[in-house]
UniProtKB/Swiss-Prot annotation:
Residues 592-603, 661-682, 751-762, 813-852 are cytoplasmic. Residues 833-852 are annotated as: Disordered. Residues 839-852 have a biased composition (Basic and acidic residues). The gene is TAS1R3. Keywords: Cell membrane, G-protein coupled receptor, Glycoprotein, Membrane, Receptor, Signal, Transducer, Transmembrane, Transmembrane helix. This is Taste receptor type 1 member 3.
């Protein structure tokens, strides 16, 4: 074992720029074990010319070094060594590893993949009818890092049901269990990352964006997923295009140039770039040379941390770069592990001992695995020591170890002896596996994905290299720290990327053209409202609700009816008090002077009955105000018509008596006068009221009024009123009263008055005129007034009718009783009666005898 002094000296030599002797890292990429794990890492990068000139099935030479690939390979080594040193996970067993370079190219990755599938102890893949007992060289594979490679290798491994755990392949298509039944990954799928990106656009109100993707499976599927996510959130993609890979021909490069030109000329200020590192590098290289105006770039995880993209000259002028990176546990011991490992690789004694051990291993048929790894210094890899995918590699190894622990049924004392585990047996324990890595508990879901948080990263330029700053987090929902974001705008204000302005409160969008984000703002009419800011149509309020113009909510309609406290009702109640007071006063006078000639000439008891009926008409007015009820609606018309019929029938008897006395021969007058007084008069009143009862009964049975709530009559209230179902039947209910009034008018209008006598006919004539004027005016007024005021109109008509009859017929008599009692004599009031006519008849007979 090497001493600390030797390690320190080796590490000091390793840190020197351009130092020294080659390392022996390339000899440390495989180690024997009871169970072998394969590893696929991008240790180098191939020259483009090697692909273009390839005419034979030989592998391209990977000459360029990839620091991240080497660090990920070292993370796998560290995880395997930790597991082998633990006594609780695989006690008594050792894991081995066989790590290969993919050069980030499918052509290169296929050779080690075939090697992994070769039969254990050989280099051959035999053809069998059944591979259940087939034991390949490795039990499981860690990697590769990209979706493009995983799409190729995944189908190889899936045929053999060999577990494959990728630490970077995020394409959603890899979640398809029917195509990739043995694929797992320790990174979330692209759908999660793209959902976070769509939430970010929605958070900042960017709904007019450009979406670009690399022209490969990764970019094409990413754009397809993003298009669906954006459409569901009301985000419009103004420009969409694919970025050709660097080795594409000039005609395909021209397409992305056209897209960038359109983006530069439009109002789009935000671009989603879901592309591989090389495609993003090519795009920005052209954008810088063509002086594309600064934008907000929403980056995919593939290029967000790429040194190749970050190091482009002029990249700082491209605008604001935001993107999401998977959050994992911090491997605090990893930087020291790398430093120690590189120090050992620089020590000749260690490398010599390692070379002797390598001689005991099988010859490496793929040649030297990473020759460029032997020519690096610590400075070459120091920038990626805390790369976020390092933990993903670490967790992938622990997932396989935990599944093997479960398969072997290991416990604290060891793992029971049994036949070697086959890959398909291990796969059964990988599904829905829960495992621990770096202090975190992780779990594969049914699609082989893990649920991990994302950090929202912002590029903050410090000199020529940007640093990644945390400005938010996504774990199913997005949380941003806006104050930490530094925008590329001169005033550090958030850029606006919208096709149309945000509609104001109470306005909805009327879409123009093909994009839902381009629209005019239209006001919501009364009775409708805007429910959500992105609505394209106004939502109608419910039947019991209302809203003003440009409203964002509906209000409950309150019930509207003729309330007791309304000014019109209060005025009518004052009028009612006046009318009822006059009726009671007149009734009191008539009762007090019931035996006087004036009262007897007015009908005596019938006159008092008529006044009582007028009082009942006044009281019936109280049925109209207030919230209507079914009983109230049914009682309004009968209880107001019947008392009026009783009053008019008594006046009809007065008119008939005056007509008989004045216009008919004395012989007829004597015969009819008895029918107009006494019991016969009451019979006439009863018959008139029975006719009215019959009409009212028919009205209530055939067309009963009902309480209805009208939701449309008033803009903000619900009108509750008694609805008349038939205006014809309503008019017929007035027929008895109208007929009695008309007969009264005819019986008194042309009657000759007698000199020196009280003109009873005149009072009746004016009373009937008041009746007709009131009810004739009532009809057009009722038809044109608001429905809510119709009860007030009928109240007013009844009270005016009562006051008209009082003023024309009863009050003059009351005046005579009070102010001129001397006229209250039989000669003044009863002279025109039948007795007087008989006296005049006798006088005429005597004069005839004298003449003879």
């Amino acid at each position: 074992m090497l001493g600390p002094a030797v390690l320190g000296l080796s590490l000091w030599a390793l840190l020197q720029p351009g130092a020294g002797a080659p390392l022996c890292l390339s000899q440390q990429l495989r180690m024997k074990g009871d169970y072998m794990l394969g590893g696929l890492f991008p240790l180098g990068e191939a020259e483009e010319a090697g692909f273009r000139s390839r005419t034979r099935p030989s592998s391209p030479v990977c000459t360029r070094f990839s620091s991240n690939g080497l660090l990920w390979a070292l993370a796998m080594k560290m995880a395997v060594e930790e597991i082998n040193n633990k006594s609780d996970l695989l006690p008594g067993l050792r894991l081995g590893y066989d790590l290969f370079d993919t050069c980030s190219e499918p052509v290169v990755a296929m050779k080690p993949s075939l090697m992994f599938l070769a039969k254990a102890g050989s280099r051959d893949i035999a053809a069998y009818c059944n591979y259940t007992q087939y034991q390949p060289r490795v039990l499981a594979v860690i990697g590769p890092h990209s979706s493009e490679l995983a799409m190729v290798t995944g189908k190889f491994f899936s045929f053999f049901l060999m577990p494959q755990v990728s630490y970077g392949a995020s394409m959603e298509l890899l979640s398809a269990r029917e195509t990739f039944p043995s694929f797992f990954r320790t990174v979330p799928s692209d759908r999660v990352q793209l959902t976070a990106a769509a939430e970010l656009l929605q958070e900042f109100g960017w709904n007019w964006v450009a979406a670009l993707g690399s022209d490969d499976e990764y970019g094409r599927q990413g754009l397809s997923i993003f298009s669906a996510l954006a459409a569901a959130r009301g985000i419009c993609i103004a420009h969409e295009g694919l970025v050709p890979l660097p080795r594409a021909d000039d005609s395909r490069l021209g397409k992305v140039q056209d897209v960038l030109h359109q983006v530069n000329q439009s109002s789009v200020q935000v671009v989603l770039l879901f592309a591989s590192v090389h495609a993003a590098h090519a795009l920005f290289n052209y954008s810088i040379s063509s002086r594309l105006s600064p934008k907000v770039w929403v980056a995919s995880e593939a290029w967000l941390t790429s040194d190749l993209v970050m190091g482009l000259p002029g990249m700082a002028q491209m605008g604001t770069v935001l993107g999401f990176l998977q959050r994992g546990a911090q491997l605090h011991e990893f930087p020291q592990y790398v430093k120690t490992h590189l120090a050992l690789a620089a020590d000749p004694a260690f490398c010599s001992a390692l070379g002797e051990r390598e001689q005991g291993l099988e010859e490496d048929v793929v040649g030297q695995r990473c020759p460029q790894c032997d020519c690096i210094t610590l400075q070459n890899v120091s920038a990626g020591l805390n790369h976020h995918q390092t933990f993903s590699v670490y967790a992938a190894v622990y997932s396989v170890a935990q599944a093997l622990h479960n398969t072997l049924q290991c416990n604290a004392s060891g793992c029971p002896a049994q036949d070697p585990v086959k890959p398909w047996q291990l796969l059964e324990n990988m599904y829905n596996l829960t495992f621990h890595a770096g202090g975190l508990m992780l779990r594969f879901d049914s699609s082989g994905n893990v649920d991990m948080e994302y950090d929202l990263k912002l590029w903050v330029w410090q000199g020529s290299v940007p640093r990644l700053h945390d400005v938010g987090r996504f774990n199913g929902s997005l949380r941003t720290e806006r104050l930490k974001i530094r925008w590329h705008t001169s005033d550090n204000q958030k850029p606006v990327s919208r096709c149309s302005r945000q509609c104001q409160e109470g306005q909805v969008r009327r879409v123009k053209g093909f994009h839902s984000c381009c629209y005019d703002c239209v006001d919501c009419e009364a009775g409708s409202y805007r429910q959500n800011p992105d609505d394209v149509t106004c939502t109608s309020c419910g039947q019991d609700e209302w809203s003003p113009e440009r409203s964002t909510r509906c209000f409950h309609r309150r019930s509207r009816f003729l309330a007791w406290g309304e000014p019109a009702v209060l005025l009518l109640l004052l009028l009612l008090s006046l009318a009822l007071g006059l009726v009671l006063a007149a009734l009191g006078l008539f009762v007090h002077h019931r035996d006087s000639p004036l009262v007897q000439a007015s009908g005596g008891p019938l006159a008092c009955f008529g006044l009582v009926c007028l009082g009942l008409v006044c009281l019936s007015v109280l049925l109209f105000p207030g919230q209507p009820s079914p009983a109230q609606c049914l009682a309004q018309q009968p209880l107001s018509h019947l008392p009026l019929t009783g009053c008019l029938s008594t006046l009809f008897l007065q008119a008939a008596e005056i007509f008989v006395e004045s216009e008919l021969p004395l012989s007829w007058a004597d015969r009819l006068s008895g029918c107009l007084r006494g019991p016969w008069a009451w019979l006439v009143v009863l018959l008139a009221m029975l006719v009215e009862v019959a009409l009212c009964t028919w009205y209530l049975v055939a067309f009963p009024p009902e309480v209805v709530t009208d939701w449309h009559m008033l803009p903000t209230e619900a009108l509750v009123h008694c609805r008349t179902r038939s205006w014809v039947s309503f008019g017929l209910a007035h027929a008895t009263n109208a007929t009695l009034a008309f007969l009264c008018f005819l019986g008194t209008f042309l009657v000759r008055s007698q000199p020196g006598r009280y003109n009873r006919a005149r009072g009746l004539t004016f009373a009937m005129l008041a009746y007709f004027i009131t009810w004739v005016s009532f009809v057009p007024l009722l038809a044109n007034v608001q429905v809510v005021l119709r009860p007030a109109v009928q109240m007013g008509a009844l009270l005016l009718c009562v006051l008209g009859i009082l003023a024309a017929f009863h009050l003059p008599r009351c005046y005579l009783l009070i102010r001129q009692p001397g006229l209250n004599t039989p000669e003044f009031f009863l002279g025109g009666g039948p007795g007087d006519a008989q006296g005049r008849n006798d006088g005429d007979t005597g004069n005839q005898g004298k003449h003879e």
